[in-house]
Amino acid sequence: MATPQFPEDFKCPISLEIMTDPVILSSGHTFDRSSIQRWLDSGNRTCPITKQLLPQNPSLIPNHALRSLISNFSFTCSSSQSKSSPQEPDPQTLISNLTCRSSTPSLHSKIYSLDQLNRLCKSNPFFRQRLTESGAVSTVLNFVGSEDSRLQESALLLLLNLSLDDDNKVGLVAEGAIGRVISALRYGKPNCKAYAATMLTSLAMVEVNKGTIGAYPFAIETLVSLLREGKGRERKEAATALYVLCSFPDNKKRAVECGATPILIEMVNSGMERAIEVMGLLAKCREGREEMGKIDECVMVLIQVLKEGSSRSIICALAVLNSLCSHSEEISLEVRRKGVLEICLGLAEDDNDKISRNASNLVQTLRRCLSRA
């Protein structure tokens, strides 16, 4: 059976791709939000089609009718294609397997349905929308609390795919996802813990969720515990989650209070780039700087990064040292004694603009501290 063709009206005039978030410009034409936003962000102030001059701050009005049409068409196509082949399950049947109250599906049936829904959700934003509107999310969240690790893992992966859309990130938090995910983070098998940490990262990509997640009981504490006790992938995902969450000011202090600093220093010493990035955020708060100042090996680990680290790690290490030296003459003198000024003078000539700029900033900080001494 041939793949159904989407009507041309469903395609964005800029990207020529099927629109996932159609919006109407004041000229009356509809575009995909991401495409027209990039057009406007580039400084364009005319309609791409009519060349009509737009207001200083153009409004983008959601085209709910067209979005619904595209969603229905996409879902119908998925269903019809599924029915045409015995290998392809019907999406509506998969959803019904999860939400039907008149029967209790077997464990195998639940896992199968979740895995198939995962496959569909991963590549189809309209199916993700349909699934969230079906009422199945609450059932999937219940599966996250399952004692069966296979069911828990499949449910976490489905939530992760649903969270690809920003609207769903907010909606999942409203549905109570944080508590379920943190429970999996605390008590799940290693693979489930890694997925749970990744899920928190995804939810925290929306600014409004960062404070909510950070303030949730055991959230930051459990991520720090995973840094301390987890293995490779679990530690990496926990560090990434902390990196995203700690861009929110209150979460920096929470991470420090939960004991993240010495663990991060140990991870930096073992070569994990994400750990030095988290340290870069913690060094922006007083509590983080004070904690780093108490740890004897902190400065030496950072100096070692300057000598042997990746470009990204060097950029972060320079920023951390600059923050520490700006607030502590004692650390500034220690850093100078250990030859950092000479290292920075060399790095100031680096071809990487960020390394050069950060090195120059640290040189200026060290010289200011010397003049005050």
Residue spans of the language-model regions?
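Structural recognition of alpha-solenoid helical scaffolds
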Residues: 90, 135-139, 168, 176-180, ...
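Alpha-helical solenoid repeats of the armadillo/HEAT superfamily
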Residues: 105-118, 148-161, 174, 189-202, ...
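Acidic, Ser/Thr-rich intrinsically disordered and amphipathic helical segments
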Residues: 14, 18, 35, 49, ...
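Tandem repeat domain/solenoid detector
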Residues: 138, 146-147, 170, 179, ...
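Buried hydrophobic core positions in alpha-solenoid tandem helical repeats
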Residues: 94-99, 139-141, 180-182, 222-224, ...
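Long alpha-helical scaffolds in large eukaryotic adaptor/regulatory proteins
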Residues: 77, 124, 166, 207, ...
